[in-house]
Amino acid sequence: MTLETHLRLNYLLSQYKTKYEKYYSKSDLEYVMKNFVNRFEDRDCINNLLLQAYEECGLSEELSVNLYGSFINHIRTDCDINGDLLEVGCGVIPSLAKSLKRRQTSGTITVMDPVIKIPEYGDLRIINGTFTEQTDVSKYKLIYGTFPCEATSAMIHSSYENDVDLYLALCGCADGKLYLDYYEYLFYLEDTMETLSNKTGRNFDIFEYSDLPYPLIKTYR
């Protein structure tokens, strides 16, 4: 890393901290402060906390692995984003949704997460809460998320039960459950959706892109 880059990152981190630190837990803020600069040039996948901060600071396109940029490109190609959307697991700072909102020509984006505390952010609608199968999704055209961990199962079941499209980039943690390996987890998800599809007539795909680390799930009519 050049000295110029190091200084620029420290400046952006200082500005970011001043503006947003009050919305973070102590441990999450410490993680961002410790890793924002020294992980910027990593070629591995980066924690969501850092992705949110880099996106807000306009740094995502400089990352070796721009996960948010890739996800936005794919969801725009694979889905119609012009409608009322719900992002589940947006994190502390919902910068992915803010960037996606700029690509919409109509519609709204609502973000939902139990850790979100910021009252206003761009043109987004904000819900502090945990997504469950009982969450009212009747107003949304599409539910989406990146690496939502424990919300994955609820998002899938909600999509089928409420006949709402889903676009989901899986994480690598297998939903916190103990599977023999990640592929066993994928087989479990596929079997679950096959059963739900047979009951509802809703279609699904599990697929991969080379610029995203884990598979994606899409449900649709």
PLM regions with names:
Residues V164-L178:
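Conserved beta-strand signature within the Rossmann-like core of class I S-adenosyl-L-methionine
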